[in-house]
Amino acid sequence: VIQGFGNVGSNLAEHLYNRDNAKIIAVGESNGYLYNKNGINIDNLKKFYKKNKNINNKNLGKFYNKPEKLLELECDILIPAALENAITLKNVKKIKTKMIIEAANGPVSFEADEELNRRGIIVLPDIYVNAGGVVVSYFEWVKNISHIRFGRVEKRFQEHKILDLINLIDQKTKVKTNPELISKIIHGANEEDLAYSGSEDSMRNAFNEILQVKKKIKKSFR
């Protein structure tokens, strides 16, 4: 369930839907939320939103005009990506999820966080969740000061190594590898691939460090 379909919410929904095959059952905006228990087609919703500037698409799900009820839907992961203090002591007891990912700034109040922690609901804090953008900005800064794009130095070297290996396999098996398949195999990572890989590695390492501290002090992730 995702609250907010702006720049953060829509792109997050797109990545979860296409890269991770996540089932997104509800998406909310300020005037209500779209719900489909079988999952919303996010690609179609993004096209609709771009054209109509709203998410009220009856072909993709049922629209409810009570935006505050979105947060009370039962789900595995709840992602507030719009409002500060979306979850407070006023509605925290109605939250029915296993994990909350704070994609907005401060969507869960301190008091609500303590209650959620007591109930065993994991809350990934905004200061961690939103760090990915800073990490990628750092990569861009490093690239700019070095005046060389990522992957340029080793790209051809890696391609030749893989091509030599394919040729060796062809010789031993006496079977010629399809040229189209060879092209796919030797295709090196582009800058976007490297940015994803680098940011994922940084976020994984950061999470493991946070997790170790959490276990040591026996508190919430916040």
Language-model segment annotations:
Residues N65-C75, L83-I101:
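Rossmann-fold NAD(P) dinucleotide-binding segment
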Residues V8-L12, A86-L89, V108-F110, G132-G133:
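Short glycine/serine/threonine-rich phosphate/pyrophosphate-binding segments
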Residues A22-A26, D76-I77, K98-I100, I121-I122:
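Structural motif
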Residues K98-R222:
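Adenosine-phosphate binding glycine-rich loop
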Residues Q3, N11, G28-S30, P80-A82, ...:
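Generic beta-strand/beta-sheet core signal
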Residues I55-N59, I77-P80, I100-E102:
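Short, flexible loop segments at the rims of nucleotide/cofactor-binding pockets, characterized by
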Residues V1-E72:
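Glycine-rich phosphate/diphosphate-binding loop of Rossmann-like nucleotide-binding domains
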Residues L16-R19, V92-K94, E114-I121:
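Short, surface-exposed basic-aromatic patches at helix termini and helix-loop junctions that form
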